[in-house]
Structure formats: structure tokens, C-alpha cells
């Protein structure tokens, strides 16, 4: 599997890199969390802007982003606006979403930016190219909070993300059975073995799928989201447990 190197952090090499989310509503609370998180054992902090009370206030986002970048020191910063249709807090019209993405580019604060595969639509390749020009790597994401599509569909979706230029295709799906968890894990291994052009991020959500958040090094997922006290998605495992298990399973 290839490696995405950001700030000396090689995503896709060795131990899966750990992401912890900031889901606070105010700038003050966001920055307090950032100061706390800067000392934790995690590689990347995700700012979930849809949880921010100024989620549609672009100047407020820009203002907070600059302070957040400083507060996190050397940790990677991932900007994410999870739309309501993909499990987030706020609904955005297509043009609003595009405007948000361009605003993040202009901050010059993002190490990584999440761009939703289906929300971006036909604009996806151009957005990814613009992100790269702005110096940000792209996590191209797709979330299904109701089901787990068949393995072939999961693989083809991640390949399409690669072909659009994404640095890190990401899939999060909801299992309805143990077989669904295995389907996601099989798709992950297939991508890592047959389409190693980029690292990938995958997870099966909820308690049933939690094993997928811990098995990435063996099966091919390069990053995992951990719960530092407040989860941003169902099934996120506590940060200290994630680190303990990743250490124990390190190849």
C-alpha cells in the first residue's frame, strides 16, 4: 500500500493512524478541546464543523480555523462538514457545500479535507485538484447508516474515489449481521491487495462492527477514529483502548 506523508506522518505505513474528533459547538470550546487533544496520543484531529454553532457562518469558521491550527501544534488537522444526508447535523444545499469546501481551501489550515463522494457529485475531480493545489490531502468519503452494500459495490466505490484523485478513500457502513462486518473487511483487504495505489479508511459502524476499527493494520485500513470522551459516530472505541489494541496487534 502506498503512503500519504503529511507533517512526517506516513498514513498507510505501519500502525493505523488515530483520528479523534472535535464536536464542540463554540469557538471557545473547540479551542479548549484542541489544547487538550494536542497532548493526547493521536495522530490527527478532525474538526466536525457541522457540530459547530457557526456551521454556516464562513467568517466564523475561518477565524476559528486559524486558532485551531496553532492550538493543535504538530497534529494533523482534518476538516469535515458531515452533511445531514450522510449522518451529520446540518443539511446543506449543493452550492452551499461547494462554497464551504472552497472556504476551507482558502484558510490554508487544512492538512486534510473530507469531501463527500455523492455530495460533490460531478465536481469531485475538480474539487480534489483544487485541494491539492491548496496543499491539502483529500479524504473522499461515503457513509451508509442503514446497511452494508455488497463487497463488489464497496470496492468499486473506493476505486472510483481513487480514479477521481482522492488521497484517502473512506467508507463507513452499518452492519445488520456478522456477515456484513465480514463483507466490509473483505472489501478492505481486496482494496489493499488489488488497488494499493492509495491508502484507504474503512469501518463497519456500531458495536457489531467495532472490530473493524481495530484490525486495520492486518486487513488494510490506514486510519481509525477513536473516542476521546465524546464519540462522533456509533461504535467508536475509547482512545486508550484503541491505542492499547493497536499496539498489541502491531505487525
Regions found by a protein language model. Give the residues of each.
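Active-site beta->alpha loop and helix N-cap motifs at the rims of alpha/beta catalytic domains
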Residues: 2-3, 13-133, 143-148
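Catalytic alpha/beta core domains of metabolic enzymes, predominantly
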Residues: 102, 112, 117-251
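Glycine-/acidic-rich phosphate or pyrophosphate-binding loops and their flanking alpha/beta elements
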Residues: 6-7
Amino acid at each position: 500500500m502506498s503512503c500519504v506523508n503529511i507533517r512526517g506522518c506516513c498514513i498507510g505505513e505501519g500502525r493505523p493512524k488515530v483520528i479523534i474528533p472535535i464536536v464542540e459547538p463554540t469557538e471557545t470550546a473547540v479551542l479548549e478541546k484542541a489544547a487538550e487533544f494536542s497532548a493526547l496520543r493521536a495522530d490527527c484531529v478532525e474538526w466536525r464543523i457541522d457540530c459547530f454553532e457557526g456551521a454556516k457562518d464562513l467568517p466564523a469558521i475561518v477565524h476559528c480555523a486559524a486558532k485551531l491550527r496553532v492550538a493543535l501544534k504538530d497534529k494533523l488537522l482534518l476538516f469535515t462538514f458531515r452533511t445531514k444526508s450522510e449522518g451529520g447535523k446540518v443539511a446543506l444545499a449543493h452550492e452551499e457545500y461547494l462554497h464551504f469546501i472552497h472556504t476551507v481551501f482558502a484558510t490554508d489550515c487544512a492538512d486534510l479535507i473530507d469531501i463527500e463522494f455523492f455530495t460533490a457529485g460531478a465536481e469531485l475531480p475538480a474539487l480534489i485538484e483544487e485541494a491539492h493545489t491548496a496543499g491539502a490531502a483529500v479524504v473522499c468519503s461515503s457513509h451508509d447508516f442503514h446497511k452494508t452494500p455488497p463487497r463488489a459495490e464497496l470496492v468499486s466505490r473506493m476505486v472510483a474515489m481513487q480514479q477521481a484523485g482522492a488521497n484517502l478513500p473512506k467508507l463507513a457502513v452499518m452492519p445488520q449481521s456478522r456477515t456484513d462486518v465480514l463483507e466490509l473487511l473483505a472489501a478492505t483487504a481486496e482494496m489493499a491487495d488489488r488497488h494499493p495505489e492509495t491508502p484507504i479508511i474503512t469501518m463497519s459502524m456500531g458495536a457489531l462492527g467495532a472490530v473493524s476499527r481495530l484490525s486495520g493494520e492486518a486487513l488494510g485500513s490506514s486510519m481509525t477514529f477513536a473516542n476521546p470522551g465524546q464519540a462522533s459516530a456509533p461504535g467508536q472505541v475509547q482512545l486508550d483502548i484503541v491505542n492499547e489494541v493497536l499496539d498489541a496487534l502491531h505487525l
